[in-house]
Regions:
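Edge beta-strands of extracellular beta-sandwich domains
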Residues: 123-129
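Sec/Tat signal peptide C-region and signal peptidase I cleavage site
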Residues: 18-22
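Aromatic (Trp/Tyr) and acidic
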Residues: 31-121, 143, 147-211, 215, ...
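Hydrophobic helical h-region of N-terminal Sec-dependent signal peptides
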Residues: 7-15
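Hydrophobic, small-residue-rich alpha-helical packing segments that form membrane-like cores
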Residues: 326-330, 337
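Carboxylate/His-rich catalytic cores and anion/metal-binding grooves
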Residues: 241-264
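Proline/serine/threonine-rich low-complexity linkers at boundaries of modular beta-sandwich domains
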Residues: 23-27
Length: 613
């Protein structure tokens, strides 16, 4: 392929608001920055890039000797410096790019800026520097959970006129009177199981996963309660309770409804699908109680009782949650191996929901450990402490925050608390040198389905090191490393893509235009920011780069919609370029790349909240 070189050219009027023809513009920007911006004290490093492999390899960029920071309001040059080649200009295998770094951390004055290659006249997207630069972004990310609420009217006052919708999934045979999947004709199995959140781009609801989300959100609140105000424009705003807790309660209340009288907890719900959600008229079904769902719920009930118990209006609610947590634990302890595989021939459940919520034995053990941690925190009962002490090694990297929660309790067994701290530190330390070798300042062990969650979780790992005083690195250094993962999601990546949907109004120049979601389906009013009336709702974090993506098994023979080859990108690209905005369903299966998830969203919320004061 013939390469196009951009070096030493006067491009002040080109690209991103320039006058060059659209077909002359490179498909990816050559200077990438956090498109929302930076807090004044943050390290600020723009990545300059020249593609070598991947779909944009036809373009090359040679940076000039001097880079400038431009105040967009005045046009003044406020700083000038030199970009430094990363790894002596070697190609980064994860991105397929040559990269350089331009450090402009000396700029701390609030304002709106851009980075300019002085010789080429080439500009980055604009960005802000401000103490509260991420606050509106965090608000949008949390409001995604409101858009994902099931069984409610999306009032225009809160959703905005573009995403207002009527009551969903509350008609005959739906969530208010859902039936057991294995007995669809038995009206005696009907249960009121309304509430909760659509789990992802599908509308299904999974108990153990929702319990995880509840626990994570409660932990996010507990870490920095002062930042969680009562003004996120959800229906509960202004009630005197932080809106994050109001939103969390929406999910927790559904987990409460899923509990049986004997303490066991139902596992999953399958809902019908249409765009918008209120157009979905098919019946709703649920799966039976399982050990995993019950342990998961026990942990959510217990932590909920602890947090909501701190608010006088929730005293009765907290007491009920405590009783439910103990009852769920008791049932799960006496029923340690009750499983249900939804949408699976093993339990004749094909068609019930989509994702497989039933974990393996290790996954059940982790859920039991989590339940014991929060029950001990709530009750101080030695039964739960003894369980944690005997099983803390069942935890893995996904349970670090939970284990550290136990280690921080005054009544935790000192030797076990120290062992947890040692184990976590030993897990974090090897990541440091790897992180230093990453071209885009956000190393992860690999890229696959849901890579943006891997990014968020790795960033949270460094932030945990700072929070808990682990390892040999100063807290400031650990937080600086964590910030790299925020910046990646906000555009410091080979695509210059903000991996959040429809964020132009909040300052992003290149955010997600379309992604896989039943509501925002192709051809709908909400399909694409660029071509549909409204585009998808703002603030959704998509899955991200996935080099393992492929079309459905059997393509191209199984359906004409396959086309002749899987779309590239994402297929056949370097790891970090294995992404494009697309929303096709079967057989193209865009959900492997662009679908949202409550898990992705909450991991990102946790990370971003750590940079909001």
């Amino acid at each position: 392929m013939a390469k196009r070189w951009i070096a030493g050219l006067a491009l002040t009027a080109a690209l991103f608001g320039h006058t060059a023809r659209a077909d002359d513009a490179p498909p990816t920007p050559f200077i990438v920055i956090d498109q929302f911006g930076y807090t004044p004290a943050m390290a600020k490093i723009a990545i300059v890039r020249s593609p070598e492999t991947g779909f944009d390899a036809g373009w090359n960029f040679t940076p000039g000797a001097l880079y400038q920071v431009i105040d967009t309001k005045t046009g003044a040059v406020v700083y000038e410096g030199r970009p430094a080649a990363f790894r002596d200009g070697a190609v980064d295998p994860a991105s397929g790019d040559h990269t350089w770094r331009f450090d402009f951390s000396v700029i701390t004055a609030p304002g709106r800026y851009l980075i300019r290659d002085k010789l080429a006249g080439y500009d980055s997207y604009p960005f802000d520097i401000a103490p509260d630069v991420y606050k509106p972004v965090l608000r949008a990310a949390v409001r995604m959970l409101y858009y994902q609420r099931a069984d409610t009217v999306k009032d225009a006052r809160f959703a905005g006129a573009a995403w207002a919708d009527g009551l969903d999934h509350m008609g005959k045979g739906q969530d208010g009177e859902a039936r057991l999947f294995s007995k669809p004709g038995d009206k005696t199995t009907a249960r009121d199981l309304h509430g909760g959140w659509f789990d992802a781009g599908d509308y299904n609801k999974y108990t153990a996963w929702t319990a995880n989300y509840v626990i994570a959100l409660l932990g996010i609140y507990a870490e920095k309660p002062a930042i969680w105000t009562d003004d996120f424009d959800i229906p509960e705003s202004g009630n005197g309770v932080p809106d994050l807790l109001d939103e969390t309660k929406w999910g927790l209340d559904w987990v409460v409804r899923m509990q049986n009288d004997d303490g066991s907890v139902l596992s999953v719900m399958g809902l019908s699908h249409a765009s918008p959600p209120s157009a979905a008229k098919g019946p709703s079904f649920y799966g039976p109680a399982t050990t995993a769902a019950t342990y998961g719920a026990a942990g959510a009930y217990a932590y909920g009782a602890k947090i909501y118990g701190g608010f006088a209006p929730f005293a009765t609610y907290a007491a009920d949650l405590k009783a439910r947590a103990i009852k769920a634990w008791t049932w799960a302890q006496s029923h340690p191996d009750v499983t249900f595989y939804n949408n699976d021939p093993r339990d004749h459940s094909e068609g019930l929901a989509a994702g497989q919520q039933e974990p393996d034995a290790h996954g059940r053990a982790v859920k039991a450990l989590v339940a014991a941690i929060y029950l001990f925190d709530l009750t101080g009962d030695d039964t739960y402490r003894a369980y944690v002490d005997a099983h803390y090694t069942d935890g893995d990297t996904d349970a670090i925050e939970l284990l550290m929660h136990y280690a921080g309790l005054a009544q935790a067994t000192p030797a076990i608390a120290q062992a947890i701290r040692t184990n976590v530190t030993q897990g974090i330390e090897p990541v440091w040198p790897k992180g230093e070798a990453d071209a885009y300042l956000s190393w992860v062990p690999g890229y696959w389905w849901g890579s943006n969650l891997i990014k968020a979780n790795t960033g949270n790992l460094f932030a945990d090191e700072a929070l808990y005083g682990l390892g040999a690195h100063p807290a400031g250094a650990a937080m600086a490393r964590a910030a790299g993962y925020v910046h990646y999601i906000h555009g410091v990546n080979p695509l210059g893509k903000v991996y959040l949907s429809n964020m132009k109004a909040l300052g992003a120049s290149n955010s997600v235009n379309r992604f896989y979601h039943t509501w925002f389906a192709p051809g709908s009013t909400w399909a694409d920011v660029r071509t549909s009336k409204f585009g998808p709702a703002p603030g959704y974090l998509v899955g991200g780069a996935n080099p393992t993506y492929t079309w459905s098994k059997g393509c191209p023979q199984i359906n004409a919609r396959c086309g002749s080859a899987p779309p590239s990108p994402p297929a056949g690209q370097p790891d970090e370029k294995a992404y494009t905005d697309f929303s096709d369903g079967w057989p193209i299966d865009s959900w492997e790349v662009t679908e949202d998830s409550e898990a992705y969203q909450i991991g990102y919320i946790r990370l971003l909240a750590r940079f909001v004061d």
